[in-house]
Amino acid sequence: MQQTFFKDPILGEIIFDENTKWMYELVNTKAFQRLRNIKQLGINFHFYPSGVHTRYAHSLGVYELIRRILNSSAFLNIDQIKKQTVLVAGLLHDLGHGPHSHAFEIYFAKNPDFKKQLFIHEKVTSMLVNSEPIVSILKANKIDPNLIGALIDENQNIQPINWWMRQLISSDLDTDRMDYLLRDAYFTGTSHSLVDYQSIINGMECVDNQGTYEIVFQEKCLPFIENFLITRHHMYQSIYSDGRSIATELNLWFVFQRIKALIEEDNFNFHNFKNVESVIKPLLKNQLFKKSLLTCFVKLDDYVFHSFLVNTFETTKDAILKTLLDSYLNTLKFQVKFYESCEKRDLDFELKVKEYQTPSYFITKFNNQFKGFYEGWNKHKNELKIKTSQNKIKNLSEISMLVKRSNELFFENSFYRWANVFYQN
């Protein structure tokens, strides 16, 4: 097989070379091809019309960033199988996303803060990795599918995962975040995401720390790392936690709360959407997603899901469900109001809830949890490490006053934005 490459507006070229050409088999599986029809930003494209890029392109981008990192001189001493394991984990890390990406996990949670999720995309990804044909492709190339699953789903605690492997897949400065910040900013037209990923890669070192390898960053990388963290913070403020996106996601949460009630009354018809029914009906009955549903799941994407919602809107005779779907499919009628405190929010909620005949479908409290500016501070051993000019390894929060002060400011002002989400005609 000749070298295969994709042209990419973010990274220039994505290459499957002599060492990774077998991974192109994974790209051609149905589970991976499905990602062509899963939008990276979920339902945010409603408000960012050009933000229709896909999990497919993002997954290829993560793979390419890892490939470039592992081809650098810093990783010459790393075992080839370990390198390929991390590459595969990066390539496959998003296989388990449902339609609308992260929002799908909210729709079937018991409450809108989704503290208890019935569908967790990392676990579904691990199931797909351990299913045919992917599992056979991995084993034929001496890659342990369980290790891939453990790299993607952090709750699977198996050995031997070196810390450097986890750092590239899931950390405060991982390849997933590098790619999605660049890609999301480009396709939404957001100008404040100027991540200098090449300078960050150039400043990486893989060092032996008491028998296990870990990634450290040269001190000259500090401005680029700080900029990366600032960029992510701003992207959450301006795009990922946009109030309109929250309102739209909660609109659909209400839709599925109503569908759930109609199913319990034996008064809902999925019509010909049997794969949708097979996947979401157990979730609406508060059952965890099971591996036996994977065959149906890989047939679900944004387009199938949208067709199901449109068909339901056109055929339902239930006035509440029709009103909720009209808001989602046509003109969004749900709004988000943020408050300075939980007490003020609750007081306003008690007044506003009286305006609705069936309030459980039209108004809810919502605690919007902020993403920390830098999360390494609360898991001290997992902090980003900086190699100083004196060759000492220190935690990022010791070196960067920006990181230290930003976290202090962040936690002084609380983890949450208290909100009410409600229908306003």
Curated annotation (Swiss-Prot):
GO molecular function terms listed in the Swiss-Prot or TrEMBL record: dGTPase activity
Domain HD residues, every copy: 55-181
One of the protein's GO biological processes: dGTP catabolic process
Listed PROSITE patterns: HD (PS51831)
SUPFAM superfamilies per UniProt: HD-domain/PDEase-like
One protein family per Pfam: HD
Protein name per its UniProtKB record: Uncharacterized protein MG461
Record organism: Mycoplasma genitalium (strain ATCC 33530 / DSM 19775 / NCTC 10195 / G37)
Taxon lineage: Bacteria, Bacillati, Mycoplasmatota, Mycoplasmoidales, Mycoplasmoidaceae
